[in-house]
């Protein structure tokens, strides 16, 4: 629940992990996991879900969106440049990025000036079947996080006078 307040120390923590005898390090990252330091001679492949959104394209949603307190917003403002610099420096230690979408590959290129192969997350499509009869509503299944913009989906459905059902949990669930 309070992990966001520890964001400034995450880089310090991930860089303290020691992996002394591995030839290949695989990380799955949306924040700092890509910052793991591989051993000398070891390779690092990062499956990336997003560059550190808290300091890049979603900064306003996290720090200035009215959802954080004044102290948290000021803290984020103070640490933003330092975290961006660390994010770029740690990306340089990755040998190969694999993004979960073309959108994320574009962000890897934009923020890190690095190419990324694309490998979409696996989905077992055979487990899903279309319903015989459709119902008159939109369905949103998501985590209640600032960057997911659940509020925008609610607003859009209200304007269109359409029903919206939302399934999920997260820090913004009470909103």
What are these regions (language model features)?
Residues 26, 93-101, 165:
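A short beta-strand/loop micro-motif in the catalytic core of glycosyltransferases
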Residues 24-27, 38-69, 117:
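Active-site proximal beta-strand in glycosyltransferases
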Residues 64-97, 105:
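Membrane-proximal helix-turn-helix segments that form the acceptor-binding/catalytic region
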Residues 29-30, 48-50, 101-102, 169:
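Helix N-cap/beta->alpha junction signal
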Residues 23-24, 43, 96, 137:
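Structural motif
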Residues 103, 122:
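Carbohydrate-associated surface elements
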Residues 123-125, 129-167:
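Conserved donor-binding/catalytic core segment of Leloir-type glycosyltransferases
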Residues 1-34:
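Active-site donor-binding segments of glycosyltransferases and PAPS-dependent sulfotransferases
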């Amino acid at each position: 629940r309070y992990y966001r307040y520890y964001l400034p120390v995450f880089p310090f923590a991930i860089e303290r992990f020691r992996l002394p005898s591995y030839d290949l390090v695989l990380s799955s990252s949306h924040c700092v996991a890509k910052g793991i330091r591989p051993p000398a001679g070891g390779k690092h492949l990062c499956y990336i879900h997003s560059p550190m959104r808290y300091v890049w394209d979603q900064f306003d949603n996290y720090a200035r969106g009215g959802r954080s307190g004044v102290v948290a917003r000021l803290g984020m403002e103070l640490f933003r440049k330092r975290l961006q610099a660390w994010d770029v420096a740690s990306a340089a230690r990755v040998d190969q990025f694999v993004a979960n979408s073309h959108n994320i590959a574009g962000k890897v290129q934009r923020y890190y000036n690095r190419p990324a192969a694309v490998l979409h997350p696996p989905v077992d499509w055979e487990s899903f079947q279309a319903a015989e009869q459709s119902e008159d509503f939109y369905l949103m299944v998501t985590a209640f996080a600032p960057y997911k913009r659940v509020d925008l989906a609610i607003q859009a459905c209200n304007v269109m006078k359409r029903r919206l059902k939302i399934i999920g949990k997260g820090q913004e669930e009470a909103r």
